[in-house]
Amino acid sequence: MKNFLQNRLNTFYIFLFFYFIVGSYLSLSVGITHDEAHSNWVWELNKKKLLNIFFNKEYDVSYLETYHGFYGIGFYLVSTPIEILYKNLVNIKNVDFEGNILLLKHPIVFIFFVISGIFFRKIILLVTKDKLFSDLTTILYLTYPYILGHSFFNVKDIPFMSVWLVNTFLIIKILDDIFNKILVKKKAFITLGILTAYLLSLRISGILIFIEYLIFFIFYLNNFNIKFLNFLKPNIKNIFIFLTSFIFFSFLFYPSFWLDPFKFLDAFKFMSQHIQTACTVTLGDCMKAQNLPTSYIFIWSFFKLPLIILFGLLIFPFLEKKLFSLKTNILLLAPLTCTVLSIIFLLIIFNVNLYDELRQIMFLIPIIFIISLIVLYNYSKKITLIITSFFIIFFIYQNIKLFPYNYLWLNNFNIFIQVDKNFEKDYWGVSTKKIANYLNKNNLENNACVISNRNEGIKHFLKSSNICLKPFSDLHKKNNRPFYVVMMERSLNKGTPINCTLIHEESIKINLSQEKVSLAKVYKCI
């Protein structure tokens, strides 16, 4: 039976290919979220800046002198050439020109997620040396609804998470080869330097990965009983190569810093206290990003992580002696654990602004998965494989049921609490496409306007460009009736508009709960 399963799972990469095809297709069916237009606008500004520098153009790029210049261009360096290819292969219907540009980035985000799955598997395999376990747990990770949902549209956090995981694998391989006296080619250090710089170009908080590098380095030094100076002497050239490539490409990926390198310091300071006026509904409280309780990360982790992962974390302390009797776990599991704890501790101590559930620490979720799954493997491989298989089936069912709102998934503890009132819902605005489709199918009365807080997302999918769209701030002004009100994202909490009737509602049911979770509403006001 075991050999049969192993032979079947030798087709993992065939599965990954079809997974990529299906996921890429589905990503094009997801609405346009609020971050996408802004990110693309910043990229356009950076392109204009490059044209100003190299071709003596005179475009206005003054916005890059503000905090907008703190965003790198890494994602778009990759997405732009792929986009050109997709334009010739994919024909997206019922979307305007600008919307088409934004939607074509969705499958590219999904590519990053698939790459993260490849390196997730590599890390699990490094620790367990068990192909069957590595394949199954990677499928578990790839079908996890919360991250899968984000991989359909999240142009910032998913690429960042994926590249972090790639760099984690690279630092493990490089250190392992160095300390085991295996020749490491210079291109490995150059690659790590480039990808570390690329990580910063996705999010300036990528600088945190040096904490992970340092922790791994300390564990390897200690385990091999090598003094720092004895390590430094034969490896100083390689360290210099890494740092040089890192610094060079960090500046290359940030055109707005070319004339003033010290802006990097401003970027680190600004992004650590990123201004966010919205609050995140957490257990019924609207927690403000600037004044979060220390429990914020732990509450969302408790409800977002799968039960199998929570169980692995729960039994970790009881298996500590067994786990760290193995050298592999000391060199891999221990540093990964220290990395997660250190970063979370620093975020809490420095009161870093966090919002929108776990998006700022999403890059830690694959590492938390790896930690928990390694613990479970050491606890009982057989039981873990059975439970993992069950969760994969359950996740597939949930993904089909929730699409395109997969990212809103909560674990089964949701049956003990009313999600609609106690947690943030469609805060990204994925429902824009479905709402637009509803408006398209149900012809609006002549000259009737639509008032919404997400006009920028809805407009791309409207068949008629003549539909009157008004900002949400116009709701309490004198408007010609009839008119329509679309409430989504955080505006859902503002109550029912006066003299308006609910005519459509987007909602989901999570897991086994029968609770209807409202995501968007359309009202007709007469």
Located regions from the model:
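Extracytosolic helix-loop segments that constitute the early lumenal/periplasmic catalytic or substrate-binding loops
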Residues: Y25, A37-G74, P81-K93, H274-L283
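Transmembrane-lumen/periplasm boundary regions of multi-pass, lipid-linked membrane glycan transferases
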Residues: K47-K49, H68-L77, Y198, F210, ...
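Transmembrane-helix motifs of polytopic, lipid-linked glycan transferases
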Residues: L103-T128, V166, L170, K321-K322, ...
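Hydrophobic/aromatic-rich transmembrane helices and adjacent perimembrane loops
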Residues: D157-V163, L199-I204, L208, I299-L313, ...
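Short acidic/glycine- and proline-prone juxtamembrane loop motifs at membrane-interface regions
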Residues: T33-H34, F152-F160
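Catalytic lumenal/periplasmic loop and adjoining terminal transmembrane helix
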Residues: S24-Y25, S29, F75, P255-W258, ...
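Transmembrane-helix signature of polytopic, membrane-embedded enzymes
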Residues: N10-I14, N91-V95, I115-T143, S162, ...
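Short helix- or helix-capping micro-motifs
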Residues: T137-L142, G149, F169, T196, ...
